[in-house]
Curated annotation (Swiss-Prot):
The gene is Btbd8. GO terms for biological process: synaptic vesicle budding from endosome; synaptic vesicle endocytosis. Neuron-specific protein. Primarily expressed in brain, with the highest levels in the cerebral cortex, hippocampus, and striatum (at protein level). Not detected in glial cells. It comes from Mus musculus. Interacts (via N-terminus) with adapter protein complex AP-2 subunits alpha (AP2A1) and beta (AP2B1). InterPro entries: BACK_BTBD8 (IPR043225), BTB/POZ_dom (IPR000210), BTBD8_BTB_POZ_1 (IPR040121), BTBD8_C (IPR027907), SKP1/BTB/POZ_sf (IPR011333). GO terms for cellular component: AP-2 adaptor complex; axon; extrinsic component of synaptic vesicle membrane; neuron projection terminus; nucleoplasm; nucleus. This is BTB/POZ domain-containing protein 8. Keywords: Cell projection, Cytoplasmic vesicle, Nucleus, Repeat, Synapse. Residues 852-863, 1210-1219, 1716-1737 have a biased composition (Low complexity).
Length: 1751
């Protein structure tokens, strides 16, 4: 604090000789000193005069002419020694206030004299002499008097001068404080000088002040006059007033000396040793305002050199002065210092002493520096800050300065962008341009231009354009060579203006633009003023920021394709645009990604196709890839394209690709490019990038417009499928028209939810994806067969998942987007939740337009009929195929992401009901997407199931798909196909006008399939759609689907259905009535489809439609139970029913076709692949090829080779989905435990996303997991998949894509137990990937054992499951309701749905048992379903639990296997993944059937049951056939499909006795598989109360799954399996629980943006509450039950894994161990599970942490 040495010396010099001392000082110094001196002297004069007037502490009284004057001897002595001497001789020195007469002077004259003495700043010697003369003349005394008095006077004078005794005293006692420097201090005036002499001479002192042991003798009167502090102290109120000596604290003797000098003399300087800062404090303390001013003056002079141009030695001292001024509070000085620092900030900030400045002062420096920005200095400050950053060393003391400089630079850039037009005219900007021209890199200019691009808004775009024109025309710019840079920015601005013309033309700056520019923009404008499109119009960042939901997507799309913007804003009018856009603004990111992918794909399509073909040839690998694809349903289109292509290349990769594809829509460009790079593999980068984008934007959109963007994104994937067909159509006029219809429907849906824009985008994205897919398909015409097969299958799987997401639709859109980002499996689930909402919308849209239904169905049919369509569209699509494929890839990815997000949305969407549905339909390619949404509704759990299945239960997924397809074989196939394929295919059908109609129906079917979550709705839609489609395109579709798409459709549908069943189960639980109705009808439809492939199917479809309509009513009843969910479903049903008949008919025909296709597809993997190729070759170019292409294209486009890696990542996504599934299941701990699951740990996002609670999970994923996390998670899984792929075909497949494993597994089922419906469902799943045939065969066997166990368990748990189902049904409806949906879902789903199906294997095991128990009470309401339910639940539980333990170790594999194991005991060990998946899918199928049947039981149970068994058989047969075909490489997919051996085998393995139950209760099986797996799981884990079980299962399941997910996620990719499983049961349960939770969260979740946050918050709350209220049968049954249920299920699953598995389970375990050896022993997993279940209380009150630790 001491002033600098130079400053210290200066004062002395100045004091000694002001003139000399100021020699080096500028004129500013002397002027300030003069002013200070005048002020101080004036103050001193007033203070001393006050002594006289107030007669303070006087000691003498003078009597003049009768008047008395009280005076002070000391003052008189100091000022008038002669007068003092004259008076004193008459007084006694000992007396105080002695009266002294003064004669010879008038009173008035004497008074004036005294005033002069006390106040004059001048020498008063003349006045004194006059008075003394008068006194002498008037004296009566002789000369003696004068003589006598003179000596006294003289003595007095001498004494005053310090020559007598006093001087000795002074030297003796005054040396301590009187120094030479002190003597040099300059007094303010003569008065000050006289008083200072008095102080130094110490005459008449009357008080001693002790400081630091030193004594300062002073005068009370002067102290009191000068200091308010001393005046109060000595006034008589304090004890010091009567003391001779007082002691002062808190002050040093140096400071006291300075203060005394100022009090007496008003000195203007300080001694060298003085601490100026401390003296400032002393001045404040003692009330010496003058001293404060002196101190400030000294600081300015000695520290700051009066703020003249700083010199190096003053940098540090000014900073020190700044600190002093801040600490003492001298604002004026602080401001001066700050202004100086601002003027030279670069020099000050680079000072080392700047690091010592308090942080608050540093912040003030920065803020004031920013405030100082103006048009003139902004460019200069930018350059200075850059120099500072470049010049500072990277050491600790510069950290603060570097940080501040970086912030300042950002602020400068922001300011420059905001005031660009003014700043470019400043001189400093010219200097900036010059410096940048001379610099090696014009990084500052690039920063400015990038900021301009990122901050373009409608308001500033015109002014920016004019400013850039000004720059371009300036000579300096041309000379410096920045023309290209400026033109690039101007080009983007121009694109924005063209795309946002309608918004821009209303701004004030528009009128200022050049007329030529205005006219050009108006002519080129995409938007001529459609208000609806305007909402989605903004393409750039600013717009995105404004529009959190659709704008984000729009922005994403716009930069990539101006057309995207237009489709976003005018879905109806911009159908063609949507085709190119990938459905519009909300799909913008996806569309952009797809476009980018398309561009890449155009070059690499052939490569991709060949890769796909190669992979297809690979068989196992291809199967694996396809399995992943199933998991990947979220990224329907691009994922499909990629997955199909990728699946051929890398079995393990497709799943990752799926995950990546899911992410890709989010990432957009980056993903596309990546996808292109990784044609064969799922793009890992794509996943990361896309996921990041999707996550950021869709989630952003989600949060801002939760349903808009996410829905868009989610539906985008589906839409991409349907859009693929649509886009193909859009490529041509027909395509456009188709898209228009779909989009019109989307529009219709648009009003319902803010998601409509996003969904519309999704539609566009879907279309794009479809085109892309198609393009790829075309390219790979020859390989299309293989590729298409896988692609179709993948597409179907994805479609089913997407459908599930669509079910969630808009509500779940955002959360689903998050989930998608999290992982492919999550993407699947998310997509399906979206579908939930979408199906009603689709129904509405379809009702509005036949095309829409056709579109939906078309998506399914698209795969099949799309092959025909592909041919038709070949020309059309060929025009747009690559671009569309690219778009589709993006869209698909984004859509998948959105769909994952939508999963949570579905709960809220049920509330919105028709509205959400309408929006969903809007989001989706209306019919297809709506159908997808419908399916998604049912599939929110299904997507996870699908993902899980994909991971390890692809067979399961296919089994489920098969099962569902038996119900909704055409519809479900269409729907399932639509799930992944609807996105791709719907676009294709739409491109084809005729086919478009059918394909739309397929889309609807796909949507329905998706709405497997809302099975009632979905199945209703499917039946209707099947009917409609059949009526419209029954024969055509049948032939086309049967020929080309049936394989894809069947497999995809099976896949979807497989995922759907679980999802349906879960959703069925939360939305069980609706789902059940849908499922039943879907099963009916499937069965009918299988029975009557074309005409017969049409009739059954119609029956289904009727049944669905009937179901719709009961669903309404269910709706009563779960008003929101049911509402949504009912809305969907109502809307869909009109469409459903056609679609159902079509789908029935499709089912027949699909059944054939399933067989074909099963065979397609190998023999049926030829079939598929033949059919698909004709249709594959478009249909199959397109699905393939979309898969490959989107995936490859997005990531190229990386994509396939992402395929494993997709599996991880699946695992993530599992985690998400688990998450939703543990709704209560969604907030914190969303990432506890295997997938969650690796990719917490995916976990959450795929969680049962579509709304909750989707949001959770979005909120919790970042795209980076997702990437990491996916990357880990991807790595596993790759290793597995490379290491072992089956093992690789299992690891890479569990769905492939299930496919292989279903093969054995199909062979060994063709008679088992469930196994058949598994077979189609299993047979999807040909490469997996071997694994699938073994898996089938394992699955069969698991199925037997499941059958046994079903027998045990059938009544509880039914009971649980019933309870859950009410909750199920709530699942459709955002908030209500969560509540009911988490409660009902936990109990009614076999969350285990959707849960990861671990989760399923845990949840399955707990859920089983929980569901056991609830599922009895399923009545007829109970046997099947129990079977599904139990066997699923046993296997799932066993798988669960392993899953902990091999999260992914185990997850898949868990489901499969639950479904197939035997399959568990060797093909645990496959088994789990197969089982899972079987269960899913069963669960779907069960769900349908449950719904039917709720609504038309009888018909439903009957239909269900048939459907299930058909599905099982299909699955079996599919699996068998894949493994056996048979071409008679139809026969195999009918056989359904895998499914039956599953039951046999599980329990021979249960197999009959399953076949008879097949429809119930689907539901029970949902409810029972949970039930069984609960049962297996331990018999916990349903609610307790639910909670325990949820929390525990999450933990276990999480632990497993962590463990096995890396080695295995059960994550996807986990996701599908989770989706099947956990999604529904969690969805309902989430719905309960999200009831609260989703009440705010009307704002789709708040879904994730709310869900997480609710989950956290629930988790926290859950610990306290483990038995949540009261206030928060759903929420707390979720956590408790998860825990219970985890424990029960663990216990069940060890106990009830039996030989079949042991066998499964052994096989699983083989499969999961890299990860962990199945036995170890089982043991872990057992330990946790054993250790935990029956209530499953373990904390999630404990469970996690245990597992």
């Amino acid at each position: 604090m001491a002033h600098c040495g130079a400053g210290g010396a200066a004062p002395v010099a100045l004091l000694s000789s002001p003139g000399h001392g100021r020699k080096g000082l500028p004129r500013k110094g002397p002027g300030e000193r003069r002013r200070l001196k005048a002020a101080v002297s004036e103050q001193l004069s007033r203070d001393v005069l006050r002594l006289l007037r107030e007669e303070i502490h006087t000691d003498t009284i003078l009597s003049v002419s009768g008047s008395l004057f009280k005076v002070h001897k000391a003052v008189l002595l100091a000022r008038a020694p002669g007068f003092h001497s004259h008076i004193i001789e008459h007084t006694s020195s000992d007396l105080t206030n002695e009266l002294v007469p003064v004669d010879g002077v008038e009173a008035s004259e004497f008074k004036a004299f005294l005033q002069i003495v006390y106040s004059s700043n001048k020498n008063i010697k003349n006045y004194e002499e006059e008075i003394v003369k008068k006194l002498k003349v008037g004296s009566l005394m002789p000369e003696k008097g004068p003589d006598v008095s003179f000596p006294r006077y003289r003595t007095s004078s001498d004494c005053f001068l310090g020559k007598g005794e006093i001087p000795e005293d002074i030297t003796g006692g005054g040396d301590c404080f009187i120094s030479k420097a002190d003597s040099d201090l300059e007094p303010a005036s003569e008065l000050g000088g006289d008083l200072l002499k008095l102080y130094l001479s110490q005459h008449y002192p009357d008080i001693d002040i002790c400081v630091d042991g030193r004594s300062f003798r002073a005068h009370r009167a002067i102290l009191s006059a000068r200091s308010s502090y001393f005046a109060a102290m000595l006034s008589g109120c304090w004890a010091e007033s009567s003391q001779e000596c007082i002691t002062l604290q808190g002050i040093t003797h140096v400071e006291m000396n300075v203060m005394m000098h100022f009090i007496y003399g008003g000195t203007l300087d300080f001694p060298e040793k003085a601490n100026v800062g401390q003296i400032l404090n002393v001045a404040d303390m003692y009330g010496l305002e003058g001293l404060r001013e002196v101190a400030i003056y000294v600081l300015r002079r000695d520290y700051c050199n009066f703020f003249q141009k700083p010199v190096p030695r003053t940098w540090a001292s000014i900073l020190e002065c700044l600190i002093i001024a801040h600490s003492v509070g001298v604002e004026s000085l602080f401001a001066d210092c700050m202004n100086c620092i601002i003027s030279h900030f670069a020099r000050f900030w680079s000072e080392r002493s700047f690091a010592n400045v308090p942080p608050e002062i540093q912040k003030t420096c920065l803020s004031m520096q920013i405030q100082s920005l103006n048009h003139g200095n902004a460019a200069f400050l930018l350059m200075e800050s850059d120099r500072l950053i470049m010049g500072l060393p990277r050491v600790k003391w510069t950290e603060a300065a570097l940080s501040m400089a970086s912030q300042l630079q950002e602020e400068c850039v922001t300011f420059i962008v905001e005031n660009f037009s003014q700043i470019i005219e400043s001189e400093n900007f010219t200097l900036l341009l010059q410096s940048q021209a001379m610099s090696s890199t014009a990084h500052l200019l690039d920063k400015i231009f990038k900021a301009i691009e990122d901050n373009i808004t409608a308001e500033n775009s015109c002014s920016l354009l004019m400013a850039l024109d000004t720059l371009l025309n300036s000579e300096s710019t041309k000379e410096m060579g920045f023309t290209c840079r400026i033109q690039a920015v101007r080009g983007k601005l121009w694109a924005f203006l063209v795309q946002s013309f309608y918004a821009v033309r209303h701004t004030g700056s528009w009128k200022l633009m050049h007329l030529d520019d205005q006219q050009k923009i108006q002519v080129a404008a995409l938007d001529k003023g459609d208000d609806r499109r305007l909402g989605r119009k903004p393409v750039l960042t600013s717009s995105q920021q404004r529009r959190q939901g659709s704008d984000v997507d729009v922005l994403k799309i716009k930069p990539w394709t101006e057309n995207n913007k237009k489709p976003c804003q005018t879905s109806l009018s911009t159908n063609q645009k949507m085709r190119s856009d990938g459905l519009g603004a909300s799909g913008h990111a996806s569309s952009t990604n797809r476009n980018s992918i398309n561009k890449v794909s155009k070059h690499g399509d052939s490569t991709k196709m060949s890769k796909v073909v190669k992979e297809m040839k690979t068989g196992g690998k291809y199967v694996s890839g396809k399995s992943k694809t199933m998991v990947k349903p979220q990224t329907e289109n691009s994922d499909h394209t990629k997955i199909e292509g990728l699946s051929s290349t890398v079995v393990g990769r497709p799943s990752r690709v799926t995950a990546a594809g899911r992410k890709d829509p989010v990432h957009g460009k980056g993903v596309q490019n990546q996808e292109v790079e990784t044609t064969g593999a799922r793009p890992k980068v794509l996943t990361a990038n896309l996921n990041v984008q999707a996550r950021a934007k869709p989630l952003q959109t989600l949060r801002g417009k939760d349903s808009t963007c996410p829905a868009s994104v989610g539906p985008s994937s589906r839409s991409t499928h349907s859009s693929t067909e649509l886009l193909a159509s859009m490529g041509s006029v027909d395509e456009t028209k188709e898209n228009g219809s779909v989009e019109d429907k989307c529009r219709d849906g648009k009003p319902y939810v803010s998601d409509s824009p996003g969904q519309m985008v999704s539609n566009g994205v879907m279309s794009t994806a479809a085109v892309k897919s198609r393009a790829v398909a075309r390219i790979t015409n020859g390989t299309a067969s293989n590729k298409s097969f896988t692609h179709e299958q993948d597409s179907h799987g994805n479609s089913s998942v997407i459908k599930r997401g669509d079910g969630k639709g808009l509500s779940a859109s955002a959360p689903q987007t998050a989930a998608k980002k999290r992982g492919s499996s999550n993407g699947c689930t998310a997509a399906q939740p979206r579908t939930k909402s979408a199906p009603p919308t689709l129904a509405q849209a379809q009702g509005s337009q036949g095309e829409s239904p056709h579109s939906v169905k078309s998506s399914v049919s698209s795969r099949q009929s799309d092959e025909n369509v592909t041919r038709l569209r070949h020309g059309t699509d060929k025009q747009i195929p690559k671009r569309k494929v690219v778009k589709q890839g993006h869209t698909t990815l984004q859509k998948v992401n959105a769909k994952l997000v939508p999963m949570p949305k579905i709960p809220s969407q049920p509330k919105k009901g028709g509205t959400v549905n309408s929006k969903d339909s809007k989001q989706k390619v209306l019919p297809g997407q709506i159908m997808l949404q419908s399916h998604a509704s049912q599939r929110p759990s299904k997507p996870e199931v699908a993902e899980k299945s994909v991971l390890h239960g692809v067979s399961d997924s296919r089994n489920h798909v098969s099962k569902q397809r038996p119900h909704e074989s055409p519809c479900t196939l269409a729907c399932d196909t639509s799930g992944p394929e609807v996105s791709q295919i719907p676009c294709r059908p739409q491109p084809q006008s005729p086919l478009g109609s059918q394909e739309k129906k397929r889309l609807e079917l796909a949507c329905q399939d998706r709405s497997t979550l809302g099975d009632s709705v979905k199945r209703e839609l499917r039946s209707e759609l099947a009917g409609i489609e059949q009526s419209h395109t029954s024969a055509y579709k049948d032939s086309s689907q049967c020929n080309g798409n049936p394989n894809c459709g069947s497999i995809a549908a099976l896949k979807s259905v497989i995922s759907n069943p679980n999802e349906n189960l879960i959703n069925s639980n939360p939305v069980h009535n609706s789902d059940s109705a849908n499922t039943e009808q879907a099963y009916l439809s499937d069965r009918e489809r299988e029975t009557g492939r074309e005409n017969t199917d049409t009739e059954p479809s119609m029956s289904c439609i009727n049944g669905k309509a009937f179901l719709c009513v009961p669903e309404g009843t269910s709706s009563t139970l779960n008003p929101t969910q049911s509402d949504r479903r009912l809305t969907f049903h109502g809307a869909a029913q009109s469409q459903l008949p056609d679609d159902c008919a079509t789908e029935d025909s499709k089912c027949a076709t699909v059944t054939s296709a399933v067989s074909s597809k099963c065979l397609l993997g190998q023999p049926s692949e030829k079939n598929c190729k033949n059919m698909e070759m004709s249709e594959t170019p478009e249909s199959h090829g397109t699905p393939e292409a979309p898969f490959v294209g989107p995936w490859d486009l997005n990531t190229g080779a990386t994509h396939q890696r992402e395929s494993p990542e997709s599996d991880t996504g699946s695992a993530t989905t599992s985690s998400d599934d688990i998450k939703p299941r543990s709704e209560d701990y969604d907030a914190g435990g969303s990432q506890d699951d295997e997938g969650s740990h690796d990719r917490g996002i995916s976990k959450c996303s795929t969680a049962l609670c579509h709304d909750f999970l989707g949001r959770s994923s979005s909120d919790t997991s970042t795209p980076e996390e997702l990437k990491v998670h996916e990357g880990d899984l991807r790595t596993e998949v790759r290793v597995r792929k490379q290491g072992g075909g089956d093992h690789q497949i299992h690891s890479a894509s569990d769905d492939e494993i299930p496919r292989k597994k279903p093969e054995p089922w199909s062979r060994s137990t063709i008679g088992y419906p469930r196994e058949k469902g598994s077979t189609p799943r299993g047979s999807i990937p040909s490469a997996q045939e071997g694994d699938q065969v073994s898996s089938s066997a394992d699955e069969t054992e698991d199925e037997r166990s499941e059958a046994e368990n079903v027998g045990e748990n059938s009544s509880p499951c039914s009971s649980g189902t019933q309870q859950v049904q009410g909750i199920i409806n709530l699942a459709f309701d955002d908030g209500a949906e969560h509540e009911s879902r988490e409660f009902s789903a936990t109990k009614k749905f076999r969350r285990s199906v959707l849960l990861s294997v671990d989760e399923c095991e845990e949840v399955g048992s707990d859920e089983g128990e929980g569901h056991t009470p609830f599922q009895p309401s399923l009545d007829s379903l109970s046997p099947s339910d129990v079977f599904d639940g139990v066997s699923y539980e046993h296997h799932g639990r066993t798988g669960y333990s392993r899953f902990f170790k091999e999260n992914e594999a185990t997850t898949a296997e868990h489901n499969h194991n639950k479904g197939n005991g035997g399959y568990k060990n060797e093909s645990f993944l496959l088994n789990s998946r197969s089982k899972d899918f079987e269960k899913q199928d069963k669960q779907c059937v069960s769900t349908d049947q449950k719904t039917r039981l709720d609504v038309p149970p009888k018909g439903s049951q009957q239909l269900f068994p048939e459907n299930e058989e058909v599905i099982s047969k299909r699955e079996a056939a599919h699996s068998f075909q894949q493994h056996s490489t048979f071409m008679d997919g139809d026969t195999k499909s009918q056989e359904r051996p895998c499914h039956l085998e599953l039951h046999q393995r599980e329990l021979s006795s249960n197999i009959p139950k399953i076949s008879s209760v097949k429809s119930l099986d689907s539901c029970p598989s949902q409810g029972l797996p949970q039930e069984g799981q609960v049962k297996e884990s331990r018999p916990t109360p349903p609610k307790g079980a639910n909670n325990a299962v949820f929390s525990g399941d999450i933990d276990d799954c999480d632990t497993m997910a962590q463990t096995s996620m890396y080695d295995h990719r059960p994550s996807k399996t986990l996701s599908p499983i989770y989706e099947m049961s956990l999604t529904a349960a969690c969805e309902q629980e989430v719905e309960s939770e999200t009831h609260v969260a989703d009440r705010g979740s009307e704002d789709e943006q708040h879904f994730a946050k709310q869900d997480w918050t609710l989950l956290r709350q629930l988790l926290s509450e859950q610990d306290a209220n483990l038995n949540i049968t009261s206030s928060l049954p759903e929420d707390l039950s979720l956590a408790q249920y998860l825990i219970n299920q985890t424990l029960l699953l663990a216990r069940d894994s060890s106990k009830p598995q039996g030989s079949a389970h042991a066998d499964t375990w052994n096989r699983w161990s083989e499969l999961s050896s890299p990860l962990d022993d199945s036995a170890t997993s089982a043991t872990t599970a057992s330990v946790s279940s054993t250790d935990c209380s029956p209530q499953g009150e373990w904390t999630i942490l404990e469970l996690e630790t245990q597992h």
